[in-house]
From Swiss-Prot:
Gene field: aroB
Residues the record lists as binding Zn(2+): 185, 248, 265
Protein name (record): 3-dehydroquinate synthase
Classification via Gene3D superfamilies: 3.40.50.1970, Dehydroquinate synthase-like - alpha domain
Cofactor binding comment, as recorded: Binds 1 divalent metal cation per subunit. Can use either Co(2+) or Zn(2+).
Lineage, top ranks: Bacteria, Bacillati, Bacillota, Clostridia, Thermoanaerobacterales
Keywords, ordered alphabetically: Amino-acid biosynthesis, Aromatic amino acid biosynthesis, Cobalt, Cytoplasm, Lyase, Metal-binding, NAD, Nucleotide-binding, Zinc
Main localization of the protein described in the UniProt heading: cytoplasm
Amino acid sequence: MDEVIVELKERSYPIYFDYEGFDRVGDLIKKHVRSSKTFVITDSNVYPLYFEKIEESLRKSGFDVLYEVIPAGETSKTMEMAQRLLEVAYDSGLLRDSSIIALGGGVVGDIAGFVAATYMRGIDFIQIPTTLLAQVDSSVGGKVAVNLKKGKNIVGAFYQPKMVYIDTSVLGTLNKREVLGGLAEVIKYGVIWDFDLFTYIEENLGDILRLKKEDLTYIVKRSCEIKAKVVSLDEKEENLRAILNFGHTIGHAIEALTGYERYIHGEAVAIGMAYEARLAFNLGYIDEGYLERILNLIKRAGLPADYEGIEKTDMLNAIKLDKKMREGRINFVLPVGLGKVDIVSVKEEDVLKVLK
């Protein structure tokens, strides 16, 4: 079993990489929590696939297991759902030394983490991500949140898990769309930090899309190493961590304007990366050759690079509602070189020029 540590001094925690199913997960979790009472939050897609295996491992390790199944999808990530889960936790007798386990993708991790962060001012939290996107991105770093109708992740906190358990064998049960959505975040890491990873994806895309074990294992672990490094250097997104938002400024606007239903998160991020790369080219930060490599990789991966049916002014207004707006200008993470990005304050008129 491989391991990567997110270094946060006394709050450091491990990311475990396992490839043999969930037999060991109960014993691993036992090392990192304070009591045997745990509340597993999962969704309607993941529950029939993995809950019994997780429950069996937890019970063998002496855990008293409660669980709740929420509807799959972004529309479950609401204050109303969080309140329901908080009430279930209270009615079930969860105490301050109890724990919450997120078993699922990014939505489950976000809302379960939000519940863990707020219940009794914070109880132990464990991440078991089951989608590629959650494994490479949302399960690591402690961002937890719910959406409001007008914006994504508006209500949330920084709340680090006690551990993350990643088993890449579960990715074989994902539909192709979910795999591609996760791959968008991996491409992001190549653009913002590690151009060797970008090149690796270009050269091994076929094997990655066929879910070849060696290639999946490499891109998942490398992505986690990059995110762990960034989070260790800037936990609360005061400066460096903002680079992880490449593609997300426009991506979040697209999600909000389409009601979180037309595009899954990774698809919206892919479109966001494409437009933010075009913006970087228009402003002179990258040359046409690099722009084309970014756009071509997004398209070769089967991801969208354009949005449909959204007016320019609506898009601009949604971008301005995002958390990245400062003093009349919009902060974008833009590529400025191979595997390098910078935070750039952009005028509204320059944003309008690049939008459809």
